[in-house]
Each structure stands twice: as C-alpha cells, then as structure tokens.
C-alpha cells in the first residue's frame, strides 16, 4: 500500500511538469460598436418631393440641342435636427442620360434630359455628393436650395417629362 500512495503522490506532483496538458489559453473579448449622428426630418417627413416643370412647355422652344425650359427652383428642407447633429452630406443618384451631366427622361417626350443643380449652379449629376453642409445651430435646420429644368438634345417631341433622383443623407 505504501508504494501505491507514493505512486499517487508522484503522479499528482508530476502533472505540474506538463502545463500544456491541462491549461487553456487566455482569450481577449473585444467589444465594439459605433455611435452615429441622429437624423434630421427631411422634406417634412414626406418620402417624395415632386417638382413640376410645368404642363405648357412648348416643343418649338426645345427644337435646338441645348435649349432648355425655365429653371424650376425648389427647396429640400432639413428640420428638427438634433443638437448633436452639426453637419451632413447628401449624395444624388438616378438614371444618367447619355450625357452624364443630366438625368434620363423616362417620360414619353423624346430627345430631352433633365438637369439638377444647386441655386449657385453646382451640377448634381448622378453620383455627385455635397459634403459637410453645416446645419444652423440656432434653428437646427438647413434649406438646400435646388433647381431643375429640361434640356433639349435636339428635335424634342411632345410628351411627358419624368425622372427620379434619390437623395441619400449622411449625418455628422
């Protein structure tokens, strides 16, 4: 029996000589996340902003390439911006015309395209992003003053004018 006890003691003490046999590696748990700026209310909460260029645009006034309908100004308003949201960027996307400076007319009028710009004439063609627009700290709002018109590609035929442009906002 004495030999049996010695063997048991020897086995227990020698198990410390082989640390890799019974020990596990340490693990680091990394917890991540991101806090983003809260959004403003865009266009009074309406998902769609309709801009009517008019129903009396004469085809004869658009017969020459480059001729255009009158500009139609409109405002895309951001309101109720949280205090923590101080600026934003907005990206414009839609179906580009053959001339990439314009959007494709998907209405029935042939040989015309649509142009979208800021009031200071910055072209907002497909893929354009306006960066770091500063929100008014007193009113917590921003008015993005835009304008649109139809541009002739030559020999415009009567019909409807239609295009959709997506404005995607990123807040900072």
Functional labels for PLM-detected ranges:
Residues 2-6, 20-172:
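Mature extracellular/passenger domains of Gram-negative fimbrial/pilin and adhesin proteins
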Residues 9-17:
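Bacterial N-terminal signal peptides
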């Amino acid at each position: 029996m004495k030999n049996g006890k010695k063997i048991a003691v020897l086995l227990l003490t020698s198990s410390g000589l082989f640390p890799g046999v019974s020990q596990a590696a340490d693990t680091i748990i990394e917890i991540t996340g991101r806090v983003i700026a809260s959004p403003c209310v865009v266009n009074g909460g309406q998902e769609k902003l309709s801009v009517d260029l008019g129903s009396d645009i004469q085809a004869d006034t658009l017969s020459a390439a480059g001729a255009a309908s009158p500009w139609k100004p409109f405002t895309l308003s951001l309101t109720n911006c949280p205090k923590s949201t101080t600026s934003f960027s907005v990206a414009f996307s839609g179906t580009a015309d053959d001339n990439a400076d314009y959007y494709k007319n998907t209405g029935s009028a042939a040989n015309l395209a649509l142009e979208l710009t800021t009031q200071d004439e910055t072209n907002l063609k497909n893929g354009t992003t306006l960066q770091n627009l500063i929100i008014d700290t007193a009113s917590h709002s921003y008015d993005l003053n835009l304008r649109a018109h139809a541009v002739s590609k030559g020999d415009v035929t009567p019909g409807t004018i239609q295009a959709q442009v997506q404005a995607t906002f990123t807040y900072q």
